Regions:
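Short, Lys/Arg-enriched N-terminal segment that forms or immediately precedes the first helix
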Residues: 35-48
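Short helix-capping/hinge SLiMs at alpha-helix to coil transitions
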Residues: 49, 64-68, 82
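DNA-recognition alpha helix
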Residues: 71-83
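Non-DNA-binding regulatory cores of transcription-related proteins
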Residues: 100-170
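C-terminal regulatory/oligomerization modules of transcriptional regulators
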Residues: 1-38, 139-170
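Pre-recognition alpha-helix immediately N-terminal to the DNA-recognition helix
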Residues: 56-61, 74
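Basic amphipathic alpha-helical segments that dock to polyanions
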Residues: 91-101
Length: 170
């Protein structure tokens, strides 16, 4: 049996878990329950990713809050608050690996801003302009069942982002 995590890696993971327990990383109400160490390790192994210290730490931070939307910068800030020694480049690279493996869904906004969604099934989003906030559109509010692909084509996926902003009092 190969040891996958060193003692140092284990301590880092435990610090992240302790930060979550202290409320530094309090999960919001979410449809999917928060994941613990074994859940994250299992997710990584299931998609063929080795559970390295960085992947486990970021996986605990990312999936430990249930279904949510985040950016690499936000996840990096959470890792910093949890005292994880991880660079922003590592966060970007790990999120790319998670996306390629199907663990998160990548959502591009304005061509350069990337969000990551832990809910990978088919669903659409509202984006609040000026507030940098992305959230799910309730399935019953948007019916795309009647959309047909052009002749000779098939629909691979549907990505809808509805941009909204607060109403002005005029």
């Amino acid at each position: 049996v190969t040891k996958l995590l060193s003692d140092e890696e284990w301590r880092t993971l435990m610090m992240a878990e302790a930060a979550r327990a202290r409320g530094v990383l309090t999960p919001p109400a979410a449809k999917r329950p928060a994941c613990g160490f074994q859940d994250v390790k299992g997710r990584l192994e299931k998609v063929g990713l080795r559970p390295t210290r960085q992947r486990m730490t970021l996986g605990l931070l990312l999936f430990g809050k249930g279904d949510r939307h985040t950016t690499a910068e936000e996840l990096y800030q959470e890792a910093t608050q949890a005292r994880a020694n991880i660079s922003l480049a590592t966060v970007y690279n790990t999120l790319k690996q998670f996306s390629d493996a199907g663990l998160v869904r990548e959502i591009a906004l304005y061509g350069s801003r990337l969000w990551y969604d832990t809910k990978t099934g088919a669903h659409q989003h509202f984006y609040v302009e000026g507030e940098e906030h992305l959230f799910d559109i309730p399935a019953e509010d948007l019916n795309l069942a009647d959309v047909r692909a052009p002749e000779g084509m098939e629909i691979v996926s549907v990505d809808v982002i509805v941009r909204v902003r607060p109403k002005t009092n005029s």
